[in-house]
């Protein structure tokens, strides 16, 4: 696995267990509901007990799984990950996700994460030609007996387990769920495998884009209506039974993590498909096998282990505990390790695959025709933005993990930090979009290209950093005078440490993916880098201040660390703001200013030239002025000059300045020769100029009195006509 594949897979490790947990928390947990019902009087509880449990089962076994499964299919369709070419495919996948959602409601979230991943691994590595042999009873039992044993031991060793109070039903429910799972894998696997063998929803070049769009629009109402309808039913159930309430914030986290999950998968698969283009036919490379992509790209070695560990961390952050005791905590960790060990036996990597999937590892180059691709593919495949795009997905996934913890813990500080991360993700996205757009060629609508978007993005990031610093200073000063004692320092330390690791990955990704191209692109990358650096410094400050507070119990360390971090960010952001604002205002530095003055002095001393007007020059980037430009100007003498700048020498391919100038010549001189002399002067100093030559007594707009008296400062550019 190369570095880029690792960066693309990390968001999957975070988003998948968060999807499992947040889907279970859309409605209050079963234990919370029992405690609420038990808090009422004994008579009321006895009367409502039957209604309560029947409603609870209806929500957890019907309405909530329907909402989760339909939402999953909706996002898969929206991100063009699965092409629902038939309703049968939609119904099969909906039923599979529905069943997995029921399992997540029965088992512990950590167990659900490992079991569902193992099921997906079994299905994607099974032989489609003989699924009954690949998934026979012996194989399935051999796979799930260790998990059945561990689940029963965890339930029995739970300190809250009480056989007399009906906790035995938990054991019977778990056994029934495993039995149903084994039977489903045994008898429904052929249908599921035939569905998984279908291609992903990426249209080949031979397929009509119009027909594909029409077919998507015809099926989209069916896919969209079911999530809305199931959510409305869930909401109506909360109205009927006041014990329930829908956690809208958890719905937001669930949808956000689904988006990150599919974007990360698409990112991972897009790179693999791009690598194959060099060695195989393009038509084949546009069609991917879902089974291959999942088993060979996503669920590779140690993926289940790492995802299970992430599930443990996410559960700890949400509930401040893994399970109810140390023994069951260790058993849960053993459950994750066993899941990885069992999955290694199903990870059969045959030498001869039915589709001959050759995995080519090659570096992405700029030679790929990305101009006509979607914005997503351009960010995902461009070598300068790919690593940063993968970090953006990782940062967004961690933001949703923080949001989940802040909702559960009611922590306003962590919620504020999550919103800060959302602002950072927005800044990263703006910077990446600007980096892609600046590489677009010039056009009739944008004759100078979009290169200055990089400068604008850098300036925007600088302003956002300035706002963040102001917010940090205000909050820190307030906490100096009104100290806030931190209590949940352990959880805060875990979150800050994870945030530090994520940001260190971001710095590493930036160093790996971004290169110094100079100019506006460099300013854009500098703005992105400063945002990542600001987050890293913030995480370092939180870790250090939290450790000092734990040791000394002095809350003053928190605002002091914030002031130091804010000062460092400010010192880094001010130079970025200064340079980008100067470029936006088209300001010339001293070196370029002297370059223009030297060229103008040469023009003023050229024989046959009486003067010049309106010299306008500004910094530019390579490729920004390659568009053919026609400058037509009519005078009383009816002179018309067209000039196309397609010079091939090195000085004009990468000019440092671009602009235009009007030059007046002596009557009787050849205008073509005069223009070529002026062009040669500018070419020698790497300035790309549009030159308009005109007779000395012409009535051009540039000869107006106001233009002739622009400046009388001898240190400024000589704007007035030069007299003979």
From Swiss-Prot:
Residues 634-648 have a biased composition (Basic and acidic residues). It is found in: Endoplasmic reticulum membrane; Nucleus membrane. Residues 614-653 are annotated as: Disordered. The keyword rRNA-binding does not apply. Residues 1-6, 80-90, 156-174, 241-244, 320-386, 439-453, 513-528, 585-724 are cytoplasmic. One of its GO terms (molecular function) is zinc ion transmembrane transporter activity. The chain crosses the membrane at residues 7-27, 59-79, 91-111, 135-155, 175-195, 220-240, 245-265, 299-319, 387-407, 418-438, 454-474, 492-512, 529-549, 564-584. Its main location: endoplasmic reticulum. GO terms for biological process: intracellular zinc ion homeostasis; transmembrane transport; zinc ion import into Golgi lumen; zinc ion transport. Originally MSC2 was identified in a screen for mutants that show an increase in meiotic unequal sister-chromatid recombination (SCR). MSC2 may also be involved in chromosome instability, rather than SRC. This is Probable zinc transporter MSC2. It comes from Saccharomyces cerevisiae (strain ATCC 204508 / S288c) (Baker's yeast). The lineage of its organism: Eukaryota, Fungi, Dikarya, Ascomycota, Saccharomycotina.
């Amino acid at each position: 696995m190369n570095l880029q594949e690792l960066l693309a897979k990390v968001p999957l490790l975070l988003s998948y267990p968060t999807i499992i947990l947040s889907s279970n928390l859309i409605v209050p947990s079963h234990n919370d509901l029992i405690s609420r019902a038990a808090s009422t009087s004994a008579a009321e509880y006895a009367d409502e007990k039957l209604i309560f449990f029947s409603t609870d089962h209806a929500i957890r076994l019907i309405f909530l799984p329907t909402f989760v499964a339909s939402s999953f299919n909706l996002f898969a369709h929206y991100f063009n990950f699965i092409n629902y070419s038939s309703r049968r495919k939609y119904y099969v996948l909906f039923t599979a996700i529905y069943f997995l959602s029921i399992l997540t409601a029965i088992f512990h979230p950590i167990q659900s994460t490992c079991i569902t991943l193992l099921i997906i691994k079994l299905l994607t590595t099974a032989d489609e030609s003989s699924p009954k042999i690949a998934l026979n009873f012996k194989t399935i039992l051999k796979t799930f007996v260790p998990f059945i044993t561990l689940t029963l031991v965890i339930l029995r060793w739970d300190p809250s387990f009480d056989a007399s109070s009906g906790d035995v039903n938990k054991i019977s429910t778990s056994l029934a769920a495993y039995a149903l799972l084994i039977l489903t894998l045994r008898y429904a696997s052929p249908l599921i495998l035939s569905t998984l063998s279908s291609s992903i929803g990426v249209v080949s070049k031979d397929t009509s884009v119009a027909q594909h769009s029409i077919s998507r629009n015809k099926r989209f109402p069916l896919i969209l209506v079911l999530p809305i309808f199931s959510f409305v039913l869930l909401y109506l159930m909360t109205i009927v039974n006041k014990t329930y309430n829908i956690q809208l914030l958890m719905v937001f986290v669930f949808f956000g993590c689904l988006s990150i999950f599919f974007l990360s998968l698409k990112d991972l698969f897009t790179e693999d498909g791009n690598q194959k283009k060099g060695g195989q036919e393009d038509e084949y490379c546009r069609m991917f096998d879902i089974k291959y992509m999942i088993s060979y790209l996503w669920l590779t070695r140690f993926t289940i282990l790492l995802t299970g560990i992430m599930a443990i961390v996410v559960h700890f952050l949400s509930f401040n505990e893994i399970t109810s005791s140390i023994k069951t905590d260790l058993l849960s960790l053993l459950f994750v390790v066993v899941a990885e060990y069992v999955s290694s036996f199903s990870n059969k990597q045959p030498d001869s695959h039915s589709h001959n999937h050759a995995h080519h590892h090659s570096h992405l180059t700029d030679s790929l025709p990305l101009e006509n691709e979607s914005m997503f593919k351009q960010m995902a495949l461009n070598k300068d933005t790919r690593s940063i795009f993968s970090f953006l997905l990782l940062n967004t996934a961690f933001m949703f993990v923080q949001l989940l913890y802040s909702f559960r813990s009611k922590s306003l500080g962590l919620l504020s930090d999550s919103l800060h991360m959302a602002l950072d993700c927005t800044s990263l996205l703006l910077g990446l979009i600007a980096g892609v757009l600046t590489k677009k060629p010039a056009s009739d609508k944008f004759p100078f290209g979009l290169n200055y978007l990089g400068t604008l993005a850098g300036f925007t990031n600088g302003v956002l950093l300035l706002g963040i610093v102001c917010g940090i200073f205000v909050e820190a000063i307030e906490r100096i005078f009104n100290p806030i004692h931190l209590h949940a320092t352990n959880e805060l330390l875990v979150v800050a440490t994870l945030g530090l690791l994520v940001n260190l990955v971001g710095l590493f990704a930036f160093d790996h993916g971004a290169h110094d191209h100079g100019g506006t692109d460099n300013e854009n990358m500098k703005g992105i880098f400063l945002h990542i650096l600001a987050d890293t410094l913030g995480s370092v400050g939180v870790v250090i201040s939290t450790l000092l507070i734990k040791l000394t119990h002095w809350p003053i360390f928190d605002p002091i660390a914030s002031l130091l971090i804010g000062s460092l960010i400010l010192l880094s952001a001010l130079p970025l703001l200064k340079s980008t604002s100067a470029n936006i205002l088209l300001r010339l530095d001293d070196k370029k200013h002297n370059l223009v003055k030297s060229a103008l002095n040469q023009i003023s001393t050229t024989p046959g030239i009486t003067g010049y007007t309106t010299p306008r020059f500004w910094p530019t980037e390579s490729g920004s002025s390659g568009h053919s430009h026609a400058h037509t100007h009519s005078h009383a003498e009816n002179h018309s000059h067209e000039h196309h700048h397609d010079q091939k020498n090195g000085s004009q391919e990468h000019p440092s300045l671009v602009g235009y100038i009007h030059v007046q010549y002596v009557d009787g001189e050849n205008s073509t020769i005069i223009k070529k002399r002026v062009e040669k002067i500018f070419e020698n100093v790497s300035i790309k100029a549009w030159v308009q030559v005109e007779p000395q007594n012409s009535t051009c707009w540039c000869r107006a009195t106001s233009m002739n008296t622009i400046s009388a400062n001898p240190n400024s550019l000589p704007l007035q006509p030069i007299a003979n």
